[in-house]
Each structure stands twice: as C-alpha cells, then as structure tokens.
Design a protein with these regions (language model features):
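Conserved donor NDP-sugar-binding/catalytic core segment of glycosyltransferases
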Residues: 99-127
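Glycine-rich, basic loop-to-helix element that forms the pyrophosphate-binding segment
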Residues: 63-80
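Conserved nucleotide-sugar donor-binding catalytic segment
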Residues: 136-216
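N-proximal low-complexity "stem/linker" segments adjacent to membrane-targeting elements
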Residues: 1-22
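A conserved acidic beta->alpha catalytic loop
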Residues: 29, 35-47, 89
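Short, acidic, metal-binding catalytic loop of nucleotide-sugar glycosyltransferases
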Residues: 21-30
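Catalytic core of nucleotide-sugar-dependent glycosyltransferases
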Residues: 193, 197-200, 206-236, 259-263, ...
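Short aromatic/hydrophobic "clamp" motif used to bind/position activated sugar donors
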Residues: 85
Length: 274
C-alpha cells in the first residue's frame, strides 16, 4: 500500500531537504511525496541540485504566492497516487517508524495519528508537551479530540480524503480532523511522538498577531457551527465541535492575557503549566 504525503512549500528552501530526508529514512519505503510550491519557486531544481531527486517525488504548484497551506494541500490532492494519505509541513520531519506504526491502524480503522514532539527551531531542543503523555493506544471521539491542545497529523485511507475548507487558514488542521472524526467515528492515537514539529517564532501561528487572528477564526467557526452550514457535520458532531471551539477560544484569550504580562511566554509553556 502506497502512502502519499503532501508537503506544502512556501519559502522552504532551507528546510525541505530535512523533511524529504525523514521520508527517505522511513522503515516502510512505499511512499510518494507531493511537493506543492506556493511561492513560485522551482523546488524540483533545488532537490535535483542536492542530489535527492527520485521517482517517488512529484512536484506541482499552486500558481500563486502565499495562497495558504489549506489551498496548497488541496492542489496536492490532484497529484496523489497512494491508497493512504498524510501530511508533512516542509519545516517538519517524521521519525523513521511513523509509517510502520500508523499504517496498520489506518488499514483497520480508516485513520490513525501519533503525538507531536514540539521542537524549538533555533535551539533544536524539545519543548514541554502540552498534554500528559498516555501510555497506551487511545480511540478519540470528537469530544476527546477537542480537549487536545496540540495538533494531530493523521494518516488515513484515500476513501476518507476530503478537501480542506477554502478560506479557513487558522486552525485549518483542527477543522480537517473534526470532519475526519465525524466520518470515521473515532481516531486511534498512539502514544509515540513520531512527528517532529519545529516551531519558528516567525511563523504565522506564533506571531504577535496570532492571538487576534485565532480569536476571530474561532468566533467565525462557532457561528458557522451554531447557525450556519456546520461544515457538513452531523448534529452531535456540531455540538461537540462548538463546545470544543468555545474552550479553545477561551484558552487563546487567557494566553493572550498572560502574554501581555510575560511577552516571551510560548503557548507550549502556557498550556503545560511551565
């Protein structure tokens, strides 16, 4: 079973090779990577110059500059050939056992996810986990998923692929996972940290304006869940998602207040109690 991996690339010249090297190090070698340029840059030439060009790599472009990771991922869907799909940001990496660990569960349940290890890009040091690490396999329903304070990057079967919602950039991964869980019922979550999530102070999600942008996004999503189309969710899922976004919005507002007193405070430190 081939797993396709979509990698949006925006100003990724200094980090894409690390992401690709982590795929080449997988203990399961049956994968395809779709690199989606979202900045007009020729990443194929970059990879070729680095001596890493191979048949498992496909290069496409959004034809735009900074259209957003949600749009880039949707463009990448048109190039996948695998029976399963997962995501990898160009500035992140997978540990070698990720496919080996998640693929059997995805075959059985439709999808599976692992925990993220958050890493400071500047120092290379792991950051405190935002949640306590469980010791066994969990099956998250939507209410349990909405209690998490860190992203999840699932691997799922092609039959469960859905396009990302256009125009939803902030917390767009949360929306995608809500729709996935609504579709499959529960999401298996292994206790291993197999996805290394590098945090840059300059990234959109960690900029000084992020709290305001997240607050507005959460308000918009809640309104859509309460009296809009509900993103196509069933009634129970709409209620769980609405309650979850209300919690996330309150947490984001508390973090913004804490940052006013302590500007250097990171979200990871805030939610982990450090």
């Amino acid at each position: 079973m081939t797993t396709s991996v979509i990698i949006p690339a925006y100003r990724a010249q200094d980090c894409l090779m690390r992401a690709l090297a982590s795929l080449r190090a997988q203990t399961i070698t049956d994968w395809q990577a779709v690199i989606v340029s979202d900045d007009g840059f020729d990443y194929r030439a970059l990879v070729e110059a680095a001596g890493m060009l191979e048949g498992r790599l496909v290069f496409v472009s959004t034809g735009r500059i900074g259209s957003g990771c949600h749009h880039a991922r949707n463009v990448g869907l048109g190039a996948i050939s695998g029976d399963a799909l997962s995501w990898l940001d160009a500035d992140d990496e997978w540990l070698p056992q990720r496919l080996e660990t998640l693929l059997p569960l995805a075959r059985q349940h439709g999808a599976a996810a692992d925990l993220l290890q958050c890493v400071d890009e500047q120092t290379g040091q792991p950051l405190p986990p935002s949640q306590g690490l469980e010791t066994g396999l969990q099956h998250l329903d939507l209410a349990a998923f909405m209690q998490l304070d860190q992203p999840l990057v699932p691997l799922f079967l092609r039959e469960h692929v859905q396009e990302r919602i256009e125009g939803a950039e902030m917390a767009e991964d949360v929306l995608a996972n809500i729709r996935l869980i609504d579709r499959i019922g529960t999401l298996p979550l292994v206790p291993q940290q197999l996805y290394r999530y590098f945090i840059r102070a300059s990234s959109l999600a960690h900029s000084e304006q992020a709290e305001d942008r997240f607050d507005q996004a959460y308000a918009d999503y809640m309104a859509r869940l309460d009296h809009g189309d509900g993103f196509g969710l069933g009634p129970a899922s709409r209620r769980a998602a609405l309650a979850g976004f209300a919690r996330k919005r309150a947490l984001n507002q508390a973090y913004a207040e804490a940052r006013r007193a302590k500007p250097a405070l990171t979200f990871q430190d805030f939610v982990s109690g450090h």
